[in-house]
Amino acid sequence: SVGFKAGVKDYRLTYYTPEYETLATDILAAFRVTPQPGVPPEEAGAAVAAESSTGTWTTVWTDGLTSLDRYKGRCYHIEPVAGEENQYIAYVAYPLDLFEEGSVTNMFTSIVGNVFGFKALRALRLEDLRIPPAYSKTFQGPPHGIQVERDKLNKYGRPLLGCTIKPKLGLSAKNYGRAVYECLRGGLDFTKDDENVNSQPFMRWRDRFLFCAEALYKAQAETGEIKGHYLNATAGTSEEMIKRAVCARELGVPIVMHDYLTGGFTANTSLAHYCRDNGLLLHIHRAMHAVIDRQRNHGIHFRVLAKALRMSGGDHIHSGTVVGKLEGERDVTLGFVDLLRDDFIEKDRSRGIYFTQDWVSMPGVLPVASGGIHVWHMPALTEIFGDDSVLQFG
């Protein structure tokens, strides 16, 4: 049949199927493809589908031992990007059976593992994923979600306020705790470890945990409110990370924190499971995200990393500020903020949402506006993010 001769063959013979009707259980991906000169877009799109599923560069006899039609990724639609020359959006459908249940790690290994170094492509960006209910239901999702968090904190109808303790590196644990107390006593709901505060020589993690817990309880007693400090549990090994989370639980604090991209999705999912089992909230920082999402034509858009985090598990995630940036960015940011919080999000290309996403009652994640914001930004922030958000100053 076509496409099964010996030698190097065109991917589009097998993997470009414009007549394909997507299934409700398929994982759908939208890639922004920039082919090398002379490579037709159909071939580039099919190459992406092939390399991220069952394809290899030639036909091998073991292909006959399985059903390619059942397991292959399919490029089912290609459209040029308006206003860009030689850029196309390639839509790829992956059969559900290609992925291990409950593993964001495996999902990314399959979809973006190999294909980004591909010779036929000058650049490639994963713009969006549609996660079908059949797959999202194999994930626990956020440890608690927005509603449970508000119940735990007894704080309703407003954004939560936080700040990061500065200078982020160099304070002793005792002085760090002092700063935490002053901030919480002054009226903030949360204070935060900086993402690079782990366990350095000038402040070991256990000392910090103890002094922060003391600050927390003192501020709680004096204000009559529930307070939190995001204790950064990120560590060099997953076991050490869980050890720190256990310590936080034993101290009775409400929330811990993790750098999910540098720590990795496997570690993050383990921590999220621990947090749900033990009543800890989980604050997620996105350190390293710009390495992956900053280039417009290559990498992975943050909305995909945000969806992955909602599946892997986290109660808060940093999601940019919008303030003072371009207007277009505002709509795109609001698009993935909705993907984090809402249950059902309609396809809306103007906001960068390529697929309708149904989370089938998976708990939501609070977006955190953080980085370079101050009190003059408050009106804009409340208008943009609404009540269900964390405004993180400092």
From Swiss-Prot:
Cofactor(s), names only, from the UniProt record: Mg(2+)
PROSITE patterns: RUBISCO_LARGE
Residues the record lists as N6-carboxylysine modifications: 192
Site feature location: Transition state stabilizer: 325
Residues modified as N6,N6,N6-trimethyllysine: 5
Group of enzyme by EC: lyase
Biological process annotations from GO: photorespiration; reductive pentose-phosphate cycle
GO molecular function terms attached to this record: magnesium ion binding; monooxygenase activity; ribulose-bisphosphate carboxylase activity
Record text on subunit structure and interactions: Heterohexadecamer of 8 large chains and 8 small chains.
Family, similarity comment: Belongs to the RuBisCO large chain family. Type I subfamily.
PANTHER family membership: RIBULOSE BISPHOSPHATE CARBOXYLASE, RIBULOSE BISPHOSPHATE CARBOXYLASE LARGE CHAIN
The name this protein goes by in its record: Ribulose bisphosphate carboxylase large chain
